């Protein structure tokens, strides 16, 4: 890169849905010669994960208010003010050309601090419905981007940056054509409210028998209980694991996936080109429902709300899908994916830095 090295500050905290897309954009711009630092919180996943990617991280002290008591609500303005001041000092020391907000509690104080320091803010909303922080930050952002249509009325739809190994998977027609035998069902539980999946899928396995084979990620600490449930159902032959390290390999193996519909999961399922049964987490603003809806509308997935997610409903749905149907759904999933999301977000960061 000619001239002075451009500097980016990425704001992303709390969950993989915020942090992993931020890392994808960071690595893309670092490969172009950019210097990148991270703004996060010291007690969440980014604190250990981001340095593993060769990126220095700064911390501010901030947490969410949802579900907190009255005292936390009353002291919130003071804590937010302090977090903004912390972020301002970090911005002044680092002097970024642009700040990229990818979500999490850190984005509110960080985005305001950037604006107060005269640094352009590019905002990316991962979910199909915008959270409170991003709705507020959109008023001061230089550019607002969204992964799914509908979060903001006039924002560009750029998708969610996903891992390169998922993007590199063969297309559905190559991967799925000619497959025989039981339908391969990938079950992704683990983080947010996976108990319903862990309770229901052993019963589905018992109902469908040799029609399906499962690879089931159950999440931390749940392996003994779920393994026992499969054994009691007479279905001990399925692969039941606590965590899947290589999700690209799991997607490549699968014919269909059963999972929650967090923003990054939905984007990965589309990029992989997989049919899905989505079970949205029961959040009051129905964020995960809106994430999954574009794939259902495209004929690539079915949404089953948690109260209706029973062994009977899931078994009936899986039994109704033959391999030709699954291939058609897989191709529709891939058709609505945005495989160059990382490049699109990075391009907006570059554009914002030039107009600063």
Curated annotation (Swiss-Prot):
Tell me what reaction this enzyme catalyses.
di-trans,octa-cis-undecaprenyl diphospho-N-acetyl-alpha-D-muramoyl-L-alanyl-D-glutamyl-meso-2,6-diaminopimeloyl-D-alanyl-D-alanine + UDP-N-acetyl-alpha-D-glucosamine = di-trans,octa-cis-undecaprenyl diphospho-[N-acetyl-alpha-D-glucosaminyl-(1->4)]-N-acetyl-alpha-D-muramoyl-L-alanyl-D-glutamyl-meso-2,6-diaminopimeloyl-D-alanyl-D-alanine + UDP + H(+)
Record InterPro entries? GlcNAc_MurG, Glyco_trans_28_C, GlycoTrans_28_N
Pfam families linked: Glyco_tran_28_C (PF04101), Glyco_transf_28 (PF03033)
Record keywords, A-Z: Cell cycle, Cell division, Cell inner membrane, Cell membrane, Cell shape, Cell wall biogenesis/degradation, Glycosyltransferase, Membrane, Peptidoglycan synthesis, Transferase
The record's GO CC annotations read: plasma membrane
Gene3D superfamilies in the cross-refs: Glycogen Phosphorylase B
What positions does the entry give for UDP-N-acetyl-alpha-D-glucosamine binding?
Answer: 15-17, 127, 163, 191, 244, 263-268, 288
Task performed by this protein: Cell wall formation. Catalyzes the transfer of a GlcNAc subunit on undecaprenyl-pyrophosphoryl-MurNAc-pentapeptide (lipid intermediate I) to form undecaprenyl-pyrophosphoryl-MurNAc-(pentapeptide)GlcNAc (lipid intermediate II).
PANTHER family tied to this protein: GLYCOSYLTRANSFERASE (PTHR21015:SF22), UDP-N-ACETYLGLUCOSAMINE--N-ACETYLMURAMYL-(PENTAPEPTIDE) PYROPHOSPHORYL-UNDECAPRENOL N-ACETYLGLUCOSAMINE TRANSFERASE 1 (PTHR21015)
The record's listing under HAMAP family reads: MurG
Q: What is this protein called?
A: UDP-N-acetylglucosamine--N-acetylmuramyl-(pentapeptide) pyrophosphoryl-undecaprenol N-acetylglucosamine transferase
Q: What is the lineage of its organism?
A: Bacteria, Pseudomonadati, Pseudomonadota, Gammaproteobacteria, Enterobacterales
Gene name in the database record: murG
